[in-house]
Amino acid sequence: MKGNVSELLNATQQAPGGGEGGRPRPSWLASTLAFILIFTIVVDILGNLLVILSVYRNKKLRNSGNIFVVSLAVADLVVAVYPYPLVLTSILNNGWNLGYLHCQVSAFLMGLSVIGSIFNITGIAMNRYCYICHSLKYDKIYSNKNSLCYVFLIWMLTLIAIMPNLQTGTLQYDPRIYSCTFTQSVSSAYTIAVVVFHFIVPMIIVIFCYLRIWVLVLQVRRRVKPDNKPKLKPQDFRNFVTMFVVFVLFAICWAPLNLIGLIVASDPATMVPRIPEWLFVASYYLAYFNSCLNAIIYGLLNQNFRKEYKKIIVSLCTAKMFFVESSNEEADKIKCKPSPLIPNNNLIKVDSV
């Protein structure tokens, strides 16, 4: 531990930004990174709290499928309430001066958040796959009790996956990004294992689930003559697209950093100096930025969440109590009700292989 502490202290004493050889960085860079992080923190906290409150208040949104959505929101909140503010402090102070313990806890929680996010996104994809492609079995497999057990399992697997970081010495301060984080160059084998099991394997599972769903969607839409086979409702398709967009954005935001990890792990001594610092920093802050996007996507693409967001904001602005269930009287007057993000009742009764 003493060695790690001395490394941390040495890192904070490097030239601004900690670039190789003490190269100075553009004066605008710290301000830009601080702005990105402040925006991410504010939108992350407000947006994901809106998601959680929306599910809590609205009975239509309070169902077994949305348990995974709430769990994903919690994973995104973790980084906004502790690690990101510490990174922001590091940017403003041009170095880490918060000590070894805060560095380790911050890096641990960052890892917990990202692994929890990808595991929850995988759980959502499996939920959507079962709902659309095996809907006859959906109610039995995804009862409220079972869904809570699945979410508990997701977080247990997340803890198991992140614990080795505490023993491998990979959680260190990186002055290039002003963050205590997973250091890719410490162990090539471990870095490759992390990328494969924490990113590539979950991505393969998610891609498989969504490809099967797209195949079914195309099959349903190509039917010309009416038949007795059930049709895919527009609400189901919109709900599926919402979660598909969440997955695509996560993959886009995190793929560059994981690709860099594989490149670095191939030969740390040779590849680390070859990775442009701007690319490394951009890949990290793109990944950081992802934590604030999901709540925005729900609001843009899902009418039920959007309406509940508005109700909560209006309640706050008018000083009304918002920890109460939303009234369904107004909704009952509407003939065409939009389905929630992940509805309770199956609209498709198809059991495809």
Curated annotation (Swiss-Prot):
GO CC, alphabetical: plasma membrane; receptor complex
SUPFAM superfamilies given in the database record: Family A G protein-coupled receptor-like
InterPro entries xref list: GPCR_Rhodpsn, GPCR_Rhodpsn_7TM, Mel_1A/1B_rcpt, Melatonin_rcpt
Listed GO MF terms: hormone binding; melatonin receptor activity
Ranges that cross the membrane: 33-53, 67-87, 106-126, 146-166, 191-211, 244-264, 278-298
Alphabetical GO biological process terms: adenylate cyclase-inhibiting G protein-coupled receptor signaling pathway; circadian rhythm
Membrane-protein topology: Multi-pass membrane protein
Disulfide bonding pattern of the chain: C103-C180
Highest taxon of the lineage: Eukaryota
Segments on the Cytoplasmic face: 54-66, 127-145, 212-243, 299-353
Localization annotation: Cell membrane
Keywords, sorted A to Z: Cell membrane, Disulfide bond, G-protein coupled receptor, Glycoprotein, Membrane, Receptor, Transducer, Transmembrane, Transmembrane helix
Pfam families tied to this protein: 7tm_1 (PF00001)
Record: glycosylation sites: N4, N10
Stretches of the chain found on the membrane's Extracellular side: 1-32, 88-105, 167-190, 265-277
Gene3D superfamilies according to UniProt: Rhodopsin 7-helix transmembrane proteins
Principal subcellular localisation of the protein: membrane
Family, per entry: Belongs to the G-protein coupled receptor 1 family.
Job of this protein: High affinity receptor for melatonin. Likely to mediate the reproductive and circadian actions of melatonin. The activity of this receptor is mediated by pertussis toxin sensitive G proteins that inhibit adenylate cyclase activity. Possibly involved in sleep induction, by melatonin activation of the potassium channel KCNMA1/BK and the dissociation of G-beta and G-gamma subunits, thereby decreasing synaptic transmission.
Protein name: Melatonin receptor type 1A
Organism of origin: Mus musculus (Mouse)
Gene name, Swiss-Prot/TrEMBL: Mtnr1a
